[in-house]
Design a protein with these regions (language model features):
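Helical scaffold of the NTase/Pol beta-like nucleotidyltransferase catalytic core
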Residues: 1-37
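Active-site nucleotide-donor binding segment shared across nucleotidyl transfer reactions
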Residues: 23-65
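Short, charged/polar surface micro-motifs in flexible loops or helix N-caps
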Residues: 57-62, 100, 111-114
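Short amphipathic alpha-helices in soluble, non-transmembrane regions
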Residues: 64-72
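Conserved catalytic core of two-metal-ion nucleotidyltransferases
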Residues: 75-112
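Catalytic cores of NTP-dependent nucleotidyl/adenyl transfer enzymes across multiple folds
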Residues: 107-183
Length: 183
């Protein structure tokens, strides 16, 4: 197994321990339908950040702050950030677990949006091969990741457009940028 796959597997193992030992999934399911983020679910983690999406059309501020209280009790974070945006509540939870810094991003969205994300994630999962997983991990390790391009770019390039080397990927990104500027 190459180094990127090995590191990603280690992160996934640590993340599973964190999620299971805290009963986090049970807590989040109390607030709506739940989806674990792509990097965690698709086993392409490159850092200690886990995204979760909770589908709930009726969430109010009292409930979201109760969720925050429950997260605080479970993790004793050193920092939490709350955002109340149009059609979205979000908690970012920063903590140290077993000597490592972790971040949980928990977004509460309308249920139909989360269900759409579930379908998209199932499609992505069906397109995965070990070779494509390696390519995704390689592109997610580059210095421009999250600054110039996102995981959505990486998944589209590798899984849909069969991009598999860095030169082709960066040319693909330039084409995407031009297409987006024209629309």
């Amino acid at each position: 197994m190459n180094e990127l796959l090995s590191y990603s597997s280690e992160l996934k193992h640590e993340a599973n321990q964190l999620v299971v030992s805290s009963n986090l999934l049970d807590l989040l399911r109390e607030y709506g339908c739940l989806l674990s983020g792509e990097s965690f679910e698709l086993n392409v983690m490159t850092n200690r950040i886990i995204n979760f999406y909770v589908g709930n059309d009726e969430m109010d501020e009292e409930s979201i702050f109760h969720m925050g209280y429950q997260l605080t009790k479970r993790f004793s974070p050193y920092k939490m950030i709350f955002a109340n945006e149009k059609d979205k509540y979000q908690w970012s939870v920063y903590m140290i677990q077993k000597g490592e810094e972790w971040k949980l991003d928990i977004s509460v969205l309308p249920e139909n949006i989360v269900k759409g994300k579930v379908k998209k994630q199932e499609l992505l999962k069906s397109l995965f091969t070990e070779k494509k997983r390696e390519c995704i991990l390689f592109f997610k390790q580059q210095s421009g990741y999250n600054r110039y391009y996102t995981s959505d770019h990486v998944y589209k390039a590798v899984l849909e457009d069969d991009i598999h080397d860095d030169m082709s990927f960066f040319m693909w990104l330039q084409r995407q940028k031009k297409v987006n500027q024209q629309t």
